[in-house]
Amino acid sequence: MHFHERFDVIVVGGGHAGTEAALAAARMGSKTLLLTHNIDTLGQMSCNPAIGGIGKGHLVKEIDALGGAMAIATDYAGIQFRTLNSSKGPAVRATRAQADRALYRQKIQNILQNQPNLRIFQQAVDDLIVENHQVVGVVTQMGLAFESPAVVLTTGTFLSGKIHIGLENYSGGRAGDPPAIALANRLRELPIRVGRLKTGTPPRIDANTIDFSQMAEQKGDSPLPVMSFMGDVSHHPKQISCWITHTNEKTHEIIRGGLDRSPMYSGVIEGIGPRYCPSIEDKIHRFADKSSHQIFIEPEGLNTSEIYPNGISTSLPFDVQLNLVRSIKGMENAEIMRPGYAIEYDYFDPRDLKNSLETKAINGLFFAGQINGTTGYEEAGAQGLLAGMNASLQVQGKEAWCPRRDEAYLGVLVDDLSTLGTKEPYRMFTSRAEYRLLLREDNADIRLTAKGRELGLVDDARWAAFSEKLESIELELQRLRGQWVHPNSPLIHALNPHLNTPISREASFEELLRRPEMDYSKLMQIEGFGPGLEDPQAAEQVQIQVKYSGYIQRQQEEINKAVRNENTGLPLTLDYKEVPGLSNEVIAKLNNHKPETIGQASRISGITPAAISILLVHLKKRGLLRKSA
């Protein structure tokens, strides 16, 4: 049975990757279908009720700069906003928001339902239709076939998902949802390497049974940050506090006593869990010398009593979970509303993907999110946007696009995955980016919005706001460079009290701002130097561009050197055994990874600069030197 319409792009799955993929393809004008097993759970925050953080906030800003929905939804759902690393340099500052689950889901669903070119249909997908290595559609659980030349799979933890609580386990995509068994079996037939990963979630606690007076209060920032470049503080709902408590030796004894019934430590779970978000069992085992671990007590929303205790993800049996929770200060009488659990699921080796996130084996088939071995809403959303965009470009007959490592954290993410692969759930950090001084949260729009407009991702309202901001920044920089003050100027009397060393020669306003003791806000408040920019985002940009100009210029020069051969393409059909001069080790690694570019090849462990030189000579001799898109 065939559906009566044909689509340009089909997206399977309605989580963070799927929603961004569907919205991106539809914004670009492609007739798009989003298939989900349950329309009510579109945009569901399956684990922690928070968006952003170190590295992750950078991805959210990049999604936003390209017209995505995550940051906008966060502004409407965020019940506590904080800027992390605020005392450090701008490269590592990151926005994090505690979100109301219901408000977030509601906003995402509202955006989806009002997006032109997007159709939503409730059915689980069981099969792919593939003809001559080209995807041509999907088949749902009820045997209904949908036709499309481009399919984006964003299956999350649903592929052969297995939920573990103690030594008991059962099939599930997440708590309360069925797994995708038939689709997982179908995908295992494809020539793509498959593995198993694991993630987990903590028990949810009833706030009415917690004694918050024994915990440290953690308030949000003032003034309040916003997540979206189009956001406004007026969009935020009521703001509330989170709380901090700690485990103790008694907690650790309870956990150690239950390890014989832990699926992780009894060999029941095969999948590898996230290194940077370990279960409480893992923490106690790996950091045996620590007498306590911090726990963040995070509300799940404004109209629910559920609390997310961030830091005690566990798959221990329920009785052990209850005892360990009640051993924690402030939770002596706590009641669990939902037990914690671990979930194992299939993922596919991302080295079998192009950097467009299209599979190398099947034309038109794209993967995004946890299916590629990542963990986190933000990583999923960023991949979803890229996959949906490239699926749309493909059906329009246009070249694929992916930002380079020096252009976006999204570029770092995709390059790491498609070049190096991953054996454990991959999480983004600022430390993964070698050019992080240029890849800041504050300039994500300056880096990406013009490209997003060119690709068709950015609407008129965002483009107008961005253009106005860009113009105001440039005009203000010109003003600061063009206005001068000299030692005999009448402005000196107001200026010198704010300087560590009074000026002894003529100086531009720009030079004054570059002084360590001066910032833009302070300079603009001095008589004769204002008025400054009213837009805080534009003002921040002016300050950073002035104060860090030398460092930024130096990093840009490094990038210019590095990218000379970065985008030189490598044919996917190239057999590296045919390249004279390469060692057997290098041949094996290159044939295994099948890098798309010289840049990717150079980042594979064991590929030496000498091997890269040999490759470049071989390509030149064979007339194969070409620049990748």
Swiss-Prot record:
Does the keyword Acetylation belong to this entry?
no
Q: Which residues form the signal peptide?
A: none
Q: Name one GO cellular component term.
A: cytosol
Q: Which residues bind NAD(+)?
A: 273-287
Where is this protein found?
Cytoplasm
What is the top-level taxon of the source organism?
Bacteria
- Principal location listed in the UniProt entry: cytoplasm
* A molecular function (GO) term: flavin adenine dinucleotide binding
Q: Which GO terms describe its biological process?
A: tRNA methylation; tRNA wobble uridine modification
Q: PROSITE patterns attached here?
A: GIDA_1 (PS01280), GIDA_2 (PS01281)
Which cofactor names does the annotation list? FAD
Which SMART domains would you find in this protein's record?
GIDA_assoc_3
Concerning InterPro entries, the annotation shows: FAD/NAD-bd_sf (IPR036188), GIDA_C_N (IPR049312), MnmG (IPR004416), MnmG-rel (IPR002218), MnmG-rel_CS (IPR020595), MnmG_C (IPR026904), MnmG_C_subdom (IPR047001), MnmG_C_subdom_sf (IPR044920)
| The keyword Transport is annotated on this UniProt entry | no
Q: Which residues bind FAD?
A: 13-18
Similarity comment: Belongs to the MnmG family.
Supply the HAMAP family for this chain. MnmG_GidA
The free-text function statement in the UniProt record for this protein reads: NAD-binding protein involved in the addition of a carboxymethylaminomethyl (cmnm) group at the wobble position (U34) of certain tRNAs, forming tRNA-cmnm(5)s(2)U34.
* Full protein name: tRNA uridine 5-carboxymethylaminomethyl modification enzyme MnmG
Q: Specify the species.
A: Shewanella baltica (strain OS195)
